[in-house]
Amino acid sequence: MKKLLNISYAILICLFCTGTSTAQNAKAEKKAEKTAELKRIVEGKNYVFKANSANPTGNSSVQVSGSSMQAGNLASMMGGGSIALTGTYDLTLSNDTLTAFLPYYGVAYTAPLNPTEGGIKFKTTKFDYKVTEKKKGNIEISFKPLDLQQRAPGDVQRMIMTVSAGGYANLQITLLNRQPISFTGTLEEVKPKPAS
């Protein structure tokens, strides 16, 4: 009887290890598929980053909708410095055209002449584009606008987007005359519109 019990335990342990191994293999295969899909989307240069929240880096005061607020008040009001965005704010790469329509929260060292040009808004076809594979299936995409006429309104020096295999992304923007800002959101493929 004791021998039968030991054999049963050994069989159960083998089954458990095999089941765990199979589950790990399935999980690894699924992650590899997601990574391959993400790589295909990024290399196709036809996608949109949809921003869900903005993360200003200022520590003294932050300009919000025309009124100056202390960063501590903003952080407590907005939940730790992250500002949830409503509406459609995005960065789109489509047909070799880079288009940005993002808000800006933070300290500006020079003010725009037109108060409606306070966000990060531009459209350009002249930019450097570099894709780097990182650990754990993440991909880093670097954008650098080259056209000074296009860069001047938004004063964008460089943008770095880190995208996970699941499509979640973090966009960090370095600006010439303003403090840096980052955004979190998702990366989605832009489907081509059917010809009519």
Which residues make up each language-model segment?
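Bacterial Sec-dependent N-terminal signal peptides
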Residues: M1-E29
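Structural motif
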Residues: N46, T97-T99, Y168
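N-terminal post-signal-peptidase region of extra-cytosolic proteins
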Residues: E33-T35, M69-G87
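Sec-dependent signal peptide cleavage junction
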Residues: G19-N59, S68-Q70, S196
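Helix-rich interaction surfaces within compact, conserved domain-sized segments
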Residues: E29-G44, F127-S196
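Surface-exposed, interaction-prone regions used to assemble/regulate multi-protein complexes
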Residues: V62-G72, G87, L113, P194
